[in-house]
Amino acid sequence: DAHGSGNAHKQQDINHLLD
């Protein structure tokens, strides 16, 4: 992941999508 630490960052992306 270019922005951070793989799955942890993907989870953050999901959180933003659900927000």
From Swiss-Prot:
It is found in: Secreted, Extracellular space. Keywords: Copper, Oxygen transport, Secreted, Transport. GO terms for molecular function: oxygen carrier activity. Hemolymph. It comes from the Eukaryota. One of its GO terms (cellular component) is extracellular region. Composed of 3 major subunits (IB, II and III) and 1 minor subunit (IA) which form homohexamers and heterohexamers. May also form larger structures. Belongs to the tyrosinase family. Hemocyanin subfamily. Hemocyanins are copper-containing oxygen carriers occurring freely dissolved in the hemolymph of many mollusks and arthropods. This is Hemocyanin subunit III.
